[in-house]
Amino acid sequence: MGRRYFGTDGIRGTVGEAPITPDFVLRLGYAAGKVLAGSADVAAGSRPTVLIGKDTRVSGYMLEAALEAGFSAAGVDVMLAGPMPTPGVAYLTRALRLSAGVVISASHNPYHDNGIKFFSADGNKLPDDTEAAIEAWLDKPLECAPSDGLGKARRLDDAAGRYIEFCKSTFPAAFDLRGLKLVIDCAHGAAYQIAPHVFHELGADVIPIGVAPNGFNINDGVGATAPDALVRAVRANHADLGIALDGDADRLQVVDATGRLYNGDELLYVLVKDRIATDGKVDGAVGTLMTNLAVEVALQREGVKFVRAAVGDRYVLEQLREHGWQLGAEGSGHILSLDRHSTGDGIVSALLVLAALKRSGRTLAQVLDGVTLFPQKLINVRMKPGADWKGSASIRAAIDAAEAALAGSGRVLIRASGTEPVLRVMVEAQQAADAVRHAETIADAVRAATT
């Protein structure tokens, strides 16, 4: 039976609508607490402890209180980190040897959405069987622990400072950032106090933007999903580089002094090239079905195997573990470097990119010279609910014709949305006109067959 609530990145939705309601989140905390209390990892007679962090959405206060109440009712102690990037919660959970970590965030979504995601004691996302066990407990009545068995809650002292020191520890001790002017866009999100300190303490001249959260402006015209604000700030301040994080700081985009934007695909190539220079070789790297073909070709030219995972950092992580590799990324800016952190971390990834540039003495444009991204055309086609697009001969014929015309110099990717009756048609080609033409032809075939 499929999962009812957990998606690829926890539970997410619009605040006030199921399942992101205070009563459900209280029961979720209770259910998760009961699963943790029954875990073999909890020593006999001891009480599990979980860490809760959140981003800056106004609803975070309500959901934090609901989670805290649920955990307490299950007999689980709670530590409150306050505003904390998702990767910060993962790190602190592992470093403090806690039973689990919980993040209240909807990442890059607008303020009226929110979500809950969990980390295991080792700082990784929960395995599927644990999520299934939590869902099973949601169906059971809530039976509050006796008064002498209730969980307690307290604030974690200097949570931000601990995470800042961890981030700095991933940057080579032989380097610093003196002489660099950096614009840091924190998306009015969880890293608004943390990220500027990290780069400043390493010596950079930091110009922070997106650091005035009011509960309603997270990701609003700023951050990794709205990089125009960063481009303008870099140009206006004559900065060397700009770094944009999203609301929970697990992804990034980078802008150079000219205002050119670099996505996760390109940054993955930069990091792989750096590892080749320092370690002699890189066995392989992981991208997704959406990774630009030019990056795959460039990595293979360097002798690096490349594997495509399904879209989602969870699936990139699965492939990295399966192959025993370290580096993976999504074009959206989720970058995994498993010898540095157990999860995607926008701040740490930015530091890795800066270290790579320091070591090479080159700019991003110079490192990526010869890697020209193929133009992509994405068309979202709305279908009738339940339409059988896979069984359509006309759609199959349009796809086959496009693939034959591209003949290895491009790609066709057809992917159904997991949340709405939409088919995503993406074509990648060396020439933009070819990508547009083939995408529109396939989209027309989809419309004719499914609407």
Curated annotation (Swiss-Prot):
It catalyses: alpha-D-glucosamine 1-phosphate = D-glucosamine 6-phosphate. The active site is at 107 (phosphoserine intermediate). Binds 1 Mg(2+) ion per subunit. Keywords: Isomerase, Magnesium, Metal-binding, Phosphoprotein. One of its GO terms (cellular component) is cytosol. GO terms for biological process: carbohydrate metabolic process; peptidoglycan biosynthetic process; UDP-N-acetylglucosamine biosynthetic process. The modification Phosphoserine is found at residue 107. Activated by phosphorylation. Mg(2+) binds at residues 107, 246, 248, 250. Its EC number is 5.4.2.10. GO terms for molecular function: magnesium ion binding; phosphoglucosamine mutase activity; phosphomannomutase activity. Its cofactor is Mg(2+). InterPro entries: A-D-PHexomutase_a/b/a-I (IPR005844), A-D-PHexomutase_a/b/a-I/II/III (IPR016055), A-D-PHexomutase_a/b/a-II (IPR005845), A-D-PHexomutase_a/b/a-III (IPR005846), A-D-PHexomutase_C (IPR005843), A-D-PHexomutase_C_sf (IPR036900), A-D-PHexomutase_CS (IPR016066), Alpha-D-phosphohexomutase_SF (IPR005841). Pfam families: PGM_PMM_I (PF02878), PGM_PMM_II (PF02879), PGM_PMM_III (PF02880), PGM_PMM_IV (PF00408). Catalyzes the conversion of glucosamine-6-phosphate to glucosamine-1-phosphate. Belongs to the phosphohexose mutase family. This is Phosphoglucosamine mutase.
